[in-house]
Each structure stands twice: as structure tokens, then as C-alpha cells.
């Protein structure tokens, strides 16, 4: 009886869990498909600068901080 219970558990619980498609994988695939269709010039324009709180050196300023403008 124990062997039958183990087999039922494996085939009714564990096997379906391993065959389920994870929903978290889909946005990554969709994002990769969208980015794949972009031209290299368009891909470079997507990068965003992180907001900065401190001021940067004037010779290294890229316009992302408030003190540079």
C-alpha cells in the first residue's frame, strides 16, 4: 500500500509541478523579444541615468545632477 501511495503522490503531485510553465519567465522573454527587434541606435537611447543626490565634478558632469545645469 505504501508503494502505491508513493507512486500516486509522485504522479499526481510532483510530476504536474515540474511540468508547469512558470509565469515569471514570460515577461523576460517578452522583453527580450521586444529589445531584439530594435536597431542598435534605438537600443542605446533606452539607457536611463540613475538620479544622484550629490554634485559631480564639472569636468566629469554628464548633466544628470542638478548642480551641473
Swiss-Prot record:
Cysteine pairings via disulfide bonds: 55-67, 56-65, 61-68
Record's subcellular location: Secreted
Primary location group: secreted
Note on domains (UniProt): The cysteine framework is III (CC-C-C-CC). Classified in the M-1 branch, since 1 residue stands between the fourth and the fifth cysteine residues.
Residue ranges annotated as propeptide in the record: 21-54
Family from the record: Belongs to the conotoxin M superfamily.
Keywords noted in UniProt: Disulfide bond, Secreted, Signal, Toxin
Listed Pfam families: Conotoxin
Gene Ontology, cellular component aspect: extracellular region
Tissue specificity comment: Expressed by the venom duct.
Residues annotated as signal peptide: 1-20
Protein name: Conotoxin Lp3.1
GO MF terms held by the record: ion channel inhibitor activity; toxin activity
InterPro entries according to UniProt: Conotoxin (IPR004214)
Domain of life: Eukaryota
Coiled-coil residue spans: none
